[in-house]
A protein has these predicted regions:
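Catalytic-pocket segment enriched in acidic/His residues
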Residues: 204-272
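HotDog/MaoC-like acyl-thioester-processing domains
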Residues: 1-31, 76-79, 97-181, 244-247, ...
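Hot-dog-fold acyl-thioester-processing enzymes
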Residues: 1-98, 158-231
Length: 296
């Protein structure tokens, strides 16, 4: 365990990770850093929190943190691990493919938290290698929030794992509303979250990485969906990132009574996920889920 006195600055970490990327040799069998980085006492910056709530569509001034906000608090620690010399995957081109969030209790916006981040594993993927990054938020000794994010480094594989069963095509979820996303969403979210990856900021910088225009942050798309959908105090949220959202753009938000949600543009799904209410149980651990209203 490595205890940090303050959160690392994301800008230098992004630059360092970019410089080291050409020298990485990604492989699912490679060794990876086992250290757990810890911020022992962190209080959210209420000004940045309010900016985050505004850009993502959450109500401002609520007592509790949005369900996605602890990811922002832990992201600098994750970036320090993934930009390090001993992390085998190149930071440039690393794609956030999914996230699972478990919130065991509401987190007050004015609370003080211990944040810890570690890399759980590397896994073979048909398109390369995937890293699983775990973030945990504690109050005293209790885990009150945790997440698992997967990040994919695309590269040629000698023996790609066999494809699993094909997903059954399902009908699109019922459309709820259409959203017009402004071209500055990436810059506004970057200012609120600290994640100023150039692919999100401007068409010119996005073109350097092969995108015709700037793209929205994946975690902004999930947060925006959850601001519309809502989440119980004790909840499990899962989301998979399917395709980038170009900025500016128009997308359709859709959901059903079973807790599923998606963001799509015509037949193209950008993100899909589900919200489940967790039953009563101890803070630490993974209590079972119970259906949301409409699941019966």
């Amino acid at each position: 365990m490595i205890v940090l006195s303050s959160a690392p600055s994301l800008g230098p970490l992004l630059a360092l990770g970019a410089l080291r990327s050409p020298f990485k040799k990604p492989s699912a069998g490679a060794d990876f850093p086992r250290a757990r980085l810890v911020l022992a006492s962190l209080r959210p910056d209420l000004r940045k929190l309010a900016a985050y709530e505004r850009v993502c569509g959450f109500a401002t001034g609520d007592d509790g943190l949005p369900v996605t906000y602890p990811h922002v608090l832990g992201f600098p620690l994750a970036m320090r691990l993934m930009s390090g010399r001993d992390f085998p995957l190149p930071l440039l081109g690393l794609v956030h493919t999914s996230i699972e969030i478990v919130r065991h209790a509401e987190l007050p916006g004015d609370g003080t938290y211990e944040i810890s981040v570690h890399i759980e594993k590397l896994s073979p993927h048909r398109r390369g290698t995937e890293a699983t990054v775990v973030t945990e938020v504690r109050v005293a000794d209790d885990v009150v929030w945790e997440s698992r994010s997967t990040y994919l480094a695309r590269h040629r594989t000698e023996t790609a794992p066999a494809d699993g069963p094909r997903e059954q095509e399902r009908a699109p979820l019922p459309a709820v509303e259409e959203w017009r996303i402004a071209g500055d969403v990436g810059r506004r979210y970057g200012a609120a979250s600290g994640d100023r990856n150039p692919i999100h900021l401007h068409p010119l910088t996005a073109r350097l990485f092969g995108f015709p225009r700037a793209i929205a942050h994946g975690m902004w798309t999930v947060a925006r969906c959850l601001a519309a959908h809502g989440a119980p105090e004790r909840a499990r949220v899962t989301a998979e990132f399917r395709a980038p959202v170009l900025l500016p753009g128009t997308v359709t938000y859709a959901e059903d009574d079973a807790g599923r949600f998606e963001l799509r543009d015509g037949d193209r799904v950008h993100v899909e996920g589900r919200v489940e209410r967790l039953g009563p149980g101890p803070l630490q651990g993974r209590p079972g889920s119970v259906p949301l209203p409409g699941d019966q």
